[in-house]
Design a protein with these regions (language model features):
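Conserved NAD(P)H cofactor-binding loop of Rossmann-fold oxidoreductase domains
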Residues: 4-15
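Catalytic loop of short-chain dehydrogenase/reductase
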Residues: 7, 23-27, 31, 57-84, ...
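PG/GG-rich flexible active-site loop of Rossmann-like NAD(P)H-dependent oxidoreductases
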Residues: 9, 63-66, 105-113
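Active-site loop of short-chain dehydrogenase/reductase
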Residues: 12, 50-63, 98-101
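Short glycine/proline- and charge-enriched loop/turn segments
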Residues: 22-23, 75, 116-125
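A short, exposed helix-loop element centered on a Lys and neighboring polar residues
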Residues: 43-44
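C-terminal helical subdomain
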Residues: 98-107, 113, 121-166
Length: 166
């Protein structure tokens, strides 16, 4: 199972506003449900069957906001609940690894190539920061097929031309 959900509303922060003054509570609540409640509910449905089978993979697709918050980047600032996704992956790793279930948090620290992404000013100015979705899928497949003797529980994918978020 790959949990990969996002939310686009509320990404534009006017220069004269601060996040708390601009962001309606309803937008935050939707983002929080997607980033914290969503993966919990999917895991609650999927992991017991994986535990019973003694095998399975649960991968959480995350972003750099799970590692640190950033000022004035609304889309990422809004997603600080993604820290909860990372914590959930860590807890599920502790609980389910011994039952043969591989859980990992995958941090996609960049822009994923798509027509919409290519239209963004940042992607047009620096095309090398755009990540190939096929290569991202390859990384997910690599995690899924890893030998149990050396599972990866967190993987950060970053374009070569940028510094990884920490």
């Amino acid at each position: 199972v790959v949990y990969n959900a996002g939310y686009l509303e509320g990404r534009e922060l006017p220069p004269e506003k601060e996040l708390l003054e601009y962001m309606p509570v309803e937008i935050f609540e939707t983002a929080q449900h997607i980033a914290s409640r969503g993966p919990f509910l999917v895991a609650k449905e999927a992991l017991p069957a994986m535990r019973e089978r003694g095998e399975g993979t649960f991968l959480i697709s995350n972003n750099a906001a799970s590692l640190r918050g950033r000022k004035r980047v609304t889309g990422q600032s809004l997603y600080y609940p993604r820290v909860m996704m990372r914590s959930l992956a860590q807890v599920l790793t502790e609980e389910y690894s011994e039952h043969g279930v591989h859980v990992a948090n995958v941090v996609i620290d960049g822009l994923i190539d798509s027509p919409g992404t290519r239209a963004m000013p940042a992607a047009q100015q620096q095309p090398e920061i755009v990540m190939d979705p096929v290569k991202i899928a390859d990384a997910f497949f690599y995690l899924h097929t890893q030998d149990r003797s050396c599972w990866t529980h967190e993987l950060q994918l970053t374009p070569f031309s940028t510094h990884p978020s920490v």
